[in-house]
Amino acid sequence: MSNPWDIVILGCGQLGGNLKTALEAEKIHVLGVRRTPVPDDSTFISLDLDVADAWEQLAQVPLAPNAVIVAIMTPDARTEDAYRQRYVGVSERLRQFVSAPGREHAVIWVSSTAVFGQHQSGVLDESVPAEPDHWRGYCLREAEQNIEQIQAATVIRLTGLYNAQSLKRLQDPEFRAQLDSKVVSNRIHREDAVSWLNALACNYLQKIPVPSLIHGVDMGSARYQEIYDFVDGVSSAIKPATVGRIVNSRYRDRMPALQYPTCEVVINSP
C-alpha cells in the first residue's frame, strides 16, 4: 500500500499545479486530481469529478487522517449550466465525501468575489454578506453554502488573478475597449494566490486555526483608468480607489506578506 496523501488537490490545473509544486517543496505528499492524464507521474490521477463513479474511485485513495482537500474548480464554459455542474455539483459531492465516517478531512474551496452582486459597492470584506444578482453569483454562493456545512472548511474568494504577462494586455487598445475604465480592478498576483493557498493548507495540517472565509486580494484596488494612466506614463503612481467596488480582507495579518502588494510592483519590474 502506498504512503497516504497529506493533501489532495481537486482540479489540479495551472493554479493547482503551482500549489502542488510549492507544497512538495516543503516535503508534503500531494496528489493532484485532474481530468487530463499526466503520463508517467504517479502523483496525479485522472478523474472526472462530475461523475459519481469518480468519487468512488477517490474513496479508495489512501489519505492521511489529517489530510486536507483543496478544490479549484473551472467550468467548461461561461454558462449557467456549466457553472452549476462544476461548482454546485462538485461541492455537493465533496460535502458528501468528507461527511462519511473516517473521512472528516478539512476542505479549502476556491471561490470568487464574483459572488457579490453588481449593486454591492464600498469596501467588501469578509463581514459583508454576499448578495448575488446574477446566475454566476448564485451558483458560486450555492457552492459556498455546501462547503459551509463541512465542519472544517475554508472558502477563499479570489479576485482577478494576474501576472506580468497578463498585465501587458492592458497596453492593448482593443483589450481596453472591452473594459469600463471607471470600474475598480480588484486583483491578486498568481504567486500570492498560491502563497495564501499554501499557508491555509499547511495551517490545517498543523492544526492552526484558519478563517472559514477569506478574500484573496492585494492592496492595490484601483480604477482601470488609474492603471492605464500609470502604464502610459501619464501618472507616477496608481491612485487607490476610494469609491466603487473595493474588495478587501480582514485577515491579511494571518496570511503571508504579499510579494506583489500592488500591480505597480509588477509593472515597474524589468
Where do the language-model regions lie?
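N-terminal Rossmann-fold NAD(P) dinucleotide-binding loop
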Residues: 16-17
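Conserved Rossmann-fold NAD(P)-dependent oxidoreductase catalytic core, especially the SDR/UDP-sugar
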Residues: 95-133
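Substrate-positioning beta->alpha
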Residues: 155-158, 166-168, 177-202
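Mid/C-terminal beta-alpha module of Rossmann-like enzyme folds, strongest
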Residues: 194-244
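Conserved Rossmann-fold cofactor-binding substructure of NAD(P)-dependent oxidoreductases
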Residues: 43-65
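C-terminal amphipathic/interface module of NAD(P)-dependent oxidoreductases
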Residues: 236-270
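NAD(P)-cofactor binding segment of oxidoreductase domains
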Residues: 66-108, 142
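Conserved beta-loop-beta element that borders a ligand/cofactor-binding pocket
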Residues: 112, 145-164
